[in-house]
Amino acid sequence: MDRRTFLQSSALFSAGAFLSPPLAFAAPADFPLVRVPAAKRNFQSQAVELAITEFKKKVKDRELAWLFENCFPSTLDTTVTFKMAGNKPDTYVITGDIDAMWLRDSSAQVWPYLKFLKQDEPLRKLVAGVINRQTQYVLKDPYANAFYDDSTKKGEWSTDRTDMQPGVHERKWEIDSLCYPIRLAYHYWQATGDAAPFDAQWQQAVKNTLRTFKEQQRKTGLGPYRFQRDTPHATDTLPMSGYGYPVKAVGLICSSFRPSDDATLYSFLVPSNFFAVVSLRQAAGMMEKLAGDQQTAQELRALAREVEQALKEHAIIDHPKHGKIYAYEVDGFGSFNLMDDANVPSLLSLPYLGAVEAADPVYRNTRKYVLSENNPFFFKGSAAEGIGGPHVGHDMVWPMSITMRALTSDDDQEIKACINLLKNTHGGTGFMHESFHKDDPKKFTRAWFAWANTLFGELLWKTYQEKPQLLV
């Protein structure tokens, strides 16, 4: 896409928020110390500290340097607890303000540190510990999305009508909860060559994942999972006795909930099925090379091919304005839900996850759609524009969506505009948040949300490495 076409088509540059001078309240007059003091940090990485020092020295924008120092190490500073369990590393990772470990969040929170593992042995052990802990959780319950450190604890959702066990914080079935640990494991292996975490227990966890995905294709019935909660929020429970609305068995995998932890409308969640295709193939390669398990590898690849073909047949619809685009959810009967949500996997994030090429014509059309006001969860205000979702509600933009917009862009102006927007909307706190009001960044949710912080740090470091001129 040439620059003229981009400027004409992108909502980004049609929004005054991106072209106007920085908002007066966007940044504090100076940049006070808001990072946790060194003595109180949960974990310190020499390699990450060197990266922070380099960024602060080379990047002349003082506010971006300040934000990078605060956000990039947020996961290490505040959310990880590392120990050796016997002779194996073991790492518990909370989300921030919620003392529970999500399989998704914990994977995403440590993801940007993978490139530093060869330089930092303690950091490598920390990430290996995350993989080991995730393995134990998948073995415990592959349908659960979040767990406690204490395996005997019963929490606030213990009365949910599903097969809750002690130690499980929440049991919302989300495809991506099983994809993220594979993504982390595969890229850890690629980055380090270390096969120690991928023992018989890890291999069994992969088999649990394969079995669960097949169960949720619902070819022979509704499967073993159901979920109901007594709640005033329709997005926190499932209709029809806890199974969700009917789907036609076409080869796709059901996801009862989205990565936002909101219930799906149609259970074939398209971004998560794309993610599953990638993860199944990564797991197949590992089972083949590390375990010599050709049978499981073949089954994983066969399922990946089946889901991939079903996506081609059922996930693409004709939009009257944008042409062929990916639906967010489908049911196999012909019904579809057009939207996108800020949480990853999203339609916007598909190239970031390695699920589609950024140049794919259907993705390009989809990108235009989700970043337009045709997407019911794209909000544009006087302070910002970006994707939100039903989890927080109307008019609340998620910084994660702005970060992901930049991470999936090949246009320098768009990347720079997104970075500037994030710089101008931290509400004076020095950190990213779950969401903020489109007209007032000081009205935000979740002051301590490590995933959003670390993801923003990933964007800044990537931009510094590849296109430092955009940080000026």
What is the role of each PLM region?
Residues A47-K60, A108-E121, Y180-A195, F274-G292, ...:
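Well-ordered alpha-helical scaffold segments within catalytic/enzyme domains
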Residues L67, P122-Y137, A195-K214, A283, ...:
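Extended, well-ordered alpha-helical scaffold segments
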Residues L76-P89, T152-R161, P246-R258, G428-E434:
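Active-site-adjacent bridging/hinge elements
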Residues L103, V138-Y143, F147-D150, E156, ...:
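Extended ligand-binding clefts on enzyme/binding-domain cores
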